[in-house]
Amino acid sequence: TTTKHDWQGYIPFDEMPYSFNPDKGYVSNGNNKIIGDEYPYYISRYWADPSRGEQIDRRLRIDAKFDVDDMKSVLNDITSPFGEEYAPIFTENYTQGFSDEGDEIYNMLKGWDGVESIDSDATVAFHAVYLQLVQNLFQDELYSFGSDSFDTFYSLKYIRSLAIRKIFDGEATLWVDNVLTDEQETLNDIVNKSFHDAHVFLSEKYGNPKDLTWGQVHQVTYRHRLDKDPLVKRLINFSVGPYPMAGSGMTPRAASYS
């Protein structure tokens, strides 16, 4: 055993992270990292992707007074900076002609502006590709740690998006090759497969991807606690929904999915 990670006490109050009357004129956060790498104390390594916070900052940066309706608009914003940045990176790394299925997803996604509205087909394509990338990049290595290790990793939504960023930014290339095959896969190979797999996934679960919109596949049901009782649920359903839901975990309008 080691005492390295034993409890050492509380962070001194005057060394706690804070922001007081910043020059930008406002304080905002979207559960994203609030400290720099030089901060001497451990607070957390499980920060939200910076996407939500970035879009909130974009909106608040405008030199204008905000009323209640303006703030409602900020909180309901459905633009994803993560999508804006990485959709073109995904499409640039896809080889057109790889497969008819992959090409169809490519055509849905190219030119997307990152707005995750309920009538957007590109949002469907982006999230399908993103989730297949997570699977194709990490499942092979994590498999060696046990059959449920990937499921545990997948459930950590903040970590998976930050990991994707690092891989496409060239900081974590060891994850790219599929260690379960004899070939040496490149990132281009993994992206090609992920575009193809995204089409297969959507087709099997929902139907023709070209006919899908974000509001059809991304929905919310507001569940009543009494619905947990099977007898009560048989008699009456107190839950309401499902309703189409714009946005995602990457937008100020927080709408993560499982």
Per-region residue spans from a language model:
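Active-site acid/base region of carbohydrate-active enzymes
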Residues: 104
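C-terminal/peripheral segments of proteins
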Residues: 1-101, 111-258
